[in-house]
Amino acid sequence: MVYNALAGTAVGLAYGMELSEIQKGIESLQSLSGRFHIIENEKYTIVDDCYNANPVSMKASIDVLAAAPGRKIAVLGDMGELGENEQELHAMVGEHFEGKGIDALFAAGALSENLAQAVGKCSKETEVHYFKTKDELMEELLPYVKSGDTVLVKASHFMGFPEVVGQLTK
């Protein structure tokens, strides 16, 4: 988002716009649902980043969650279209949890089992919850989340995680 704002600023300046006019435009931007959309309700903060996922974006989202206030909960699902190394790439994302201070992982999906196992090995500070399906995950997640928590929800779109965000925002 920052790089997009910088690129937009450069284009605006190239076309003779005033910096104050560009600033107003940038300040009025709102993130799209599923694309690092931050939702704050009376209970907790949800980072809705479940439109798509790949190893780089997963790691970046985990880094953002690590810097968030309160108890940090990562709700992650499978990453699609990774090819023959998909299991290793999921495990690599799990290894990224080491030293991040993430309190809990709720993972669902066949490939995310690799991610959950890697978190269990690399991050003793993270409570790991693995489920085969998104529905099983939601059943355990909803009563787990408390006031003041920050919850990252991220998976490839085919996993249907917007439903998780919808349940959390009820």
Where are these regions (language model features)?
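Short-chain dehydrogenase/reductase
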Residues: M1
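ATP-dependent carboxylate-amine ligase
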Residues: A7-K170
